[in-house]
Amino acid sequence: MVKKIMIVRHGEKPDRDSEIHGVDASGEHDRNELSPQGWQRSGALIRFFNPASGQFSSPALAKPDAIFAAGPSGDTPSLRSKNTVQGVADSLRLHLNLRHTKGEEKKLVDEVMTVGGVVLIAWEHKAILDIVNLILGNARSSPQHWPDSRFDLVWVLDAQPHPAGWKFTQLPQLLLPHDSPHVL
């Protein structure tokens, strides 16, 4: 049974109102990809979730046993969630599960609940609210808005003894210079 679920928003994306573009791993423009800053976050998340020293920045964090990200589809071709955590998966020698796409949050949660240990999920921020509400069983135990400008949070859900269910915690990542120390 899953004991901890950590959820991050995909890394920074291209800004429609500026000259910042999405780029693929080879540096070619791709609007469905991370921005250069998103790629920086992706790289920093490797040691955030797999610290070389074995010491996490918070006791609420743990090394993932399984990693899920929103898979690209015809309706949502974005590769941002995948590329945000691909490096983490590679560093831990884990398969990155891309089976579910945006809009399939219920199927994602159903599968995550069958996984043992610790799960990391990277997803689109508005749909993260749906994922957390499905896990918690209500919309009162967690924030119901994730600002468009925030890419620097981790939401952690820890399984509690029955009948308590889940404990919700938020953590700032504090990985890049502009990251906020404040949670929602």
Named regions from a protein language model:
Residues 124:
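Short loop/turn segments immediately following the C-termini of beta-strands
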Residues 1-116, 127-184:
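Active-site-proximal alpha-helix that buttresses catalytic centers in soluble enzyme cores
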